[in-house]
Amino acid sequence: LGDVYKRQAPSSILGKSHGHVPPSDRLNIAAVGIGGMGHTNINHVKATENIVALCDVDWRYAKGVFDELPNAKKYWDYRKMYDEMGKDIDAVIIATADHTHAIITADAMTMGKHVYCQKPLTHSVYESRLLTRLAASTGVVTQMGNQGSSDEGTDLVCEWIWNGEIGDVTKVECATDRPIWPQGLNVPEKEDRIPKTLNWDLFTGPAKMNPYNEIYHPWNWRGWWDYGTGALGDMACHILHQPFRALKLLYPTKVEGSSTLLLNACAPQAQHVKLTFPARENMPKVAMPEVEVHWYDGGMMPDRPKGFPEGKQLMQSGGGLTIFHGTKDTLICGCYGQNPWLLSGRVPNAPKVCRRVPKAMNGGHEMDWVRACKESPSSRVMPKSDFSEAGPMNEMVAMGVLAIRLQGLNKTLEWDGANMRFTNIGDDETLRTVIKDGFKIHNGHPSFDKTWTDPVNAKAFAEELIKHNYREGWKLPDMPR
């Protein structure tokens, strides 16, 4: 009877007295947001773990996963799932729209549940800082879903730079071929009927309530500021993590952004961001001077480095690019840090100091999180993108969004990272943003008719972007001291 109980009882019951779940036991995992990347994450763990609960605000979009896992209990509202099944859940996978990542993740962590949250980790700087501190205070195992951080390409980039192979790095340029969804759009003028299979109130969550339009969901929410973070949120966690880790970055001190037409509700079609990071503590074989990190998307690209092979495409594997400009050489890699190479043609033989994760891009990233969940806290090896690193790295992404949305101030913004505030936005400065682009051609003649917001206090506007004011009924846990 005891053996039968051990096979059937929740692993949270079996492991808590020992502080861990034995590797032979299966985690009881709940998933929130299962129709897109959540489905992929579930597929990578379901063979070895128990998927006990599934939650989604759109049951038509989620139907395929519901059908694949008929024994899992189904929910619309993650809060009800946590209330009813909290004692039976060990860990949660979260793959909802960006604007709900933080609250769903934070609530799970405060319940003592391990969490795997898709990228971008959060929608704002404050939310990232909160999850970083909650990870430290709760001790749960955390992982952001940027699988390239576990891939060997990222390991090689770090090892080459730390071994001094390219010298000191003072400039990094990163680019993506995204967005591949609509951006630069006016707010829809018509309201569509909400499908019976979609709970629009729950999708909206802590954001302001907008009239439903089919342009927002599914997937295209990425381009709308209330729900997504544009191409930065979609791809920067894959492409900026290599410079963040390899160069030991933390908070930038200066940010600036520019873009195609900036609208108040929708991300621009293309953008450029520059973040300046102060000098860090030198490593044994390489210095860590002040460094500029540049981001390009929407077709914008950095210049081809001097000596780059003619006829060779600058952006390579995965639709992403990173160029590390060193004093001795130039290191170039694709999306996720894959296929790194040196412009000189040398092939470094640097010591392999980074832990390798097998099959990182094909489930290894998720299973490395599962491994850590089952280990004893006293000897646990955290996964490669746990929130102690993913949280500050995601702040870098959120800072890029801030730089774009505040570009109308027409200056380099100075950032106090420790206190999460800009130091050079005056109390009386104002900002206007375009609401609607009314460009038309009539009888062969163009007409330009932009509708602008009224001037708003720039400091208050920035503060709301840094720390969102949640809709009534939605509240984050308090920031741990």
Pin down the residues of each PLM region.
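Short, small-residue-biased leader/transition segments that mark boundaries at the very start
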Residues: 1-5
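N-terminal Rossmann-like dinucleotide-binding module
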Residues: 7-69, 148-151, 243
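Hydrophobic residues in well-ordered beta-strands that form the structural core
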Residues: 31, 94, 117, 142-144, ...
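Glycine-enriched catalytic-core subsegment of oxygenase/oxidase enzymes
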Residues: 47-48, 55, 59-62, 235, ...
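Beta-loop-alpha module in the N-terminal Rossmann-like domain of NAD(P)-dependent dehydrogenases
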Residues: 72-130
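A contiguous active-site-proximal alpha/beta segment in oxidoreductase catalytic domains
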Residues: 114-116, 122-198
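Oxidoreductase and adenylate-handling cofactor-binding alpha/beta cores
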Residues: 151-174, 186-189, 204, 233-260, ...
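Core domains of carbohydrate- and sulfate-ester-processing enzymes
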Residues: 173-214, 426, 430-466
